[in-house]
């Protein structure tokens, strides 16, 4: 099976969908073309433009380490001849605090990372005070030295 979307994680999902289809009695000539024609979800590795010199601009809403890692890995594999510059805005101080170590290791497939700020939403004062940009940048730099504080 050959997919339009990159990533072993999506190929794995397609194999699972194929298996479910077969268990439900569907034939290959129905299942396979649909899976091979799948172009991806809105705001997940979505190509939104190309610059004049050929840089590809993508948008991805993944904001959890379990989404970021496989997405960047897939982009790195598909565009191995290109540099990957990521702009990432963590969503919620509390989530960033809770998943700090996971976020720290999530950007190894990026060449550079810019973090503008942490998006405030329903956060408690103690989370905002504890989860500073300096702390986030410091943890990420242990695994991705090319991280920039964008605020």
Q: Where are the regions a protein language model picked out?
A:
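Nucleotide phosphate-binding/pyrophosphate-handling subdomain across enzymes
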Residues: 2-112
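C-terminal helical cap/extension that packs against the catalytic core
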Residues: 56, 104-151
